[in-house]
Swiss-Prot record:
Cofactor: FAD
Protein name: L-aspartate oxidase
Cofactor binding, per record: Binds 1 FAD per subunit.
Function: Catalyzes the oxidation of L-aspartate to iminoaspartate, the first step in the de novo biosynthesis of NAD(+).
GO cellular component, one term: cytoplasm
Classification via SUPFAM superfamilies: FAD/NAD(P)-binding domain (SSF51905), Succinate dehydrogenase/fumarate reductase flavoprotein C-terminal domain (SSF46977), Succinate dehydrogenase/fumarate reductase flavoprotein, catalytic domain (SSF56425)
A Pfam family of this chain: Succ_DH_flav_C
Length: 464
């Protein structure tokens, strides 16, 4: 059996290693793992394994944070495998340096490595994957080839490569927004490609904006752990206006409101005595930007950070296409609900990577050896799409703005895979006539029980 993994972040590497361990031939397509968003992950991974903590506490926090849109079975399934995920990492020699408290969590369960967790974990996984015989091709798998609802393979530079199974682990699409903390090339191309081919997307309207982005010479995240350590959010006049440890949707929205009032928002970390020791990389970055967190306020702004929705999969990470799977941020099966809790994403990456390998091994798919059409799409005007998404499908939404965004999108000449994804977000945000988690409608500011169900997008239509 030959398996292709599209994506070289934490989810993709975990799946590749788990399959290679069973003697399966695995090829990973994508950039160097150091260029993945997983590598940029700062705070850490939520593991409810310490004395005083519990799985049920973590489950409760996740469902409460997800505004009760979560698939409860999936939440239990992922979090109950926390110990296995923890041992997967520690068995590779990875050692965590501290535990932190972050917004929405009722216990300090965020295991971190010097608050630059991704930079320590990803190289270790890549090294072990290579030692296990995983093949790495540093090229982009442009399209997925499907025939009669069965996987055929992937196109790379126009060439069709045949595989028995394809696992999409390409991350989300925060790069579809003008301001993002991730890599700007994270446009969700594989997600849009599959949407064009009839694969359903789930909860695609839920985009998480990190409350405390720093836009300087480059965009950088000031980790949630800094607020967990006692930093306060204030206006230029020194006014505190939000509970810093509220969930990200609430904090991002309140910061954005202040900015709409014409007020600057700052993070006051001057009360953290050991800032340099606890957050060495953030400290170094800020010093390079001319800011000393021991005495200066840090200007912050919300930035697109994480896409909660994605390719619709079941609890075993299967799509409706035989032999096609999706994991990590690229996928959605209801784990996060309407709002992802901080540091739950890396846990999901590990668990979904391990679980999908079990699914593939159990199902033993056989790919179709058929010809498939290659489209060779051109990028087009992606920046115009980014402007539309930021202005019309951002932190605060309303019907007129969403409809205007759709009209503007029709006129843009851009990669159809990018356009269909932007269209999906706008249409599902329009269909969800309520506010829930990361989706906030100014014209429907409250949650409505009749909308406590997932949205499903299938080629041009969003169903709720």
């Amino acid at each position: 059996m030959k398996v292709a993994v599209v994506g070289s972040g934490l989810a993709g590497l975990t799946a590749a290693m788990s399959l290679a361990k069973k003697g399966i031939e695995v090829t990973v397509f994508g950039p160097k793992p150091k260029e993945s968003n997983s590598y940029l992950a700062q705070a850490g991974i939520a593991f409810p394994i310490s004395d005083g903590d519990s799985i049920i506490s973590h489950v409760t926090d996740t469902i409460r944070g997800g505004k009760y849109l979560n698939d409860v079975t999936v939440v239990w399934n992922v979090i109950s495998k926390s110990t296995e995920a923890y041992h997967f990492l520690t068995s590779l020699g990875i050692e965590f340096t501290s535990r932190e408290l972050e917004g929405g969590h009722s216990f300090p369960r965020i295991f971190t490595i010097k608050n630059e967790t991704g930079k320590y974990i990803i190289p270790v996984l890549e090294k072990h994957a290579k030692e296990m015989g995983v093949n790495f091709i540093r090229k982009f798998a442009e399209e997925v080839a499907i025939h009669n609802k069965k996987i055929v393979g992937v196109f790379v530079e126009g060439e069709l490569l045949y595989f028995d199974a394809v696992i999409i682990a390409s991350g989300g699409f925060s790069g579809l927004y003008k301001f993002t903390a991730g890599n700007p090339w994270n446009l969700g191309i594989p997600i849009g490609d599959l949407a064009l081919k009839g694969v359903p997307l789930r909860d695609i309207e839920f985009i998480q904006f990190h409350p405390t982005g720093f836009i300087g010479k480059r965009t950088y995240l000031i980790s949630e752990a800094v607020r967990g350590a006692g930093a306060k959010l204030v206006t230029g006049e020194g006014e505190r206006f939000v509970n810093e440890l509220e969930t990200r949707d609430v904090v991002a929205r309140e910061i954005y409101r202040k900015m709409l009032e014409g007020k600057g928002v700052f993070l006051d970390a001057t009360g953290i005595e050991d800032f340099k020791r606890r957050f060495p990389y953030i400290y170094s970055f800020l010093r390079r930007e001319g800011i000393n967190p021991k005495r200066d306020l840090i200007p912050v702004t919300p930035v697109a950070h994480y896409t909660i929705g994605g390719i619709s999969v079941d609890i075993f990470y299967r799509t409706p296409i035989k032999g096609l799977y999706a994991i990590g941020e690229a996928a959605c099966n209801g784990f996060h609900g309407a709002n992802r809790l901080a540091s739950n994403s890396l846990l999901e990456c590990i668990v979904s990577g391990i679980e999908v390998s079990r699914t593939v091994i159990r199902e033993k798919p056989r790919g179709e050896r058929k010809e498939a059409k290659y489209h060779g799409y051109e990028p087009g005007n992606v920046d115009e799409v980014r402007d539309i998404m930021w202005n019309h499908a951002g932190i605060i939404r309303r019907e007129e703005s969403l409809r205007l965004g759709l009209k503007k999108l029709e006129k843009v000449e851009a990669d159809p895979r990018v356009k269909i994804l932007a269209e999906a977000v706008l249409k599902c945000a329009l269909a969800r006539e309520e506010s829930r988690g990361a989706h906030y409608r100014e014209d429907y500011p409250y949650s409505r029980e009749e909308f406590r169900r997932p949205s499903i997008f299938r080629v041009e239509n969003c169903m709720l």
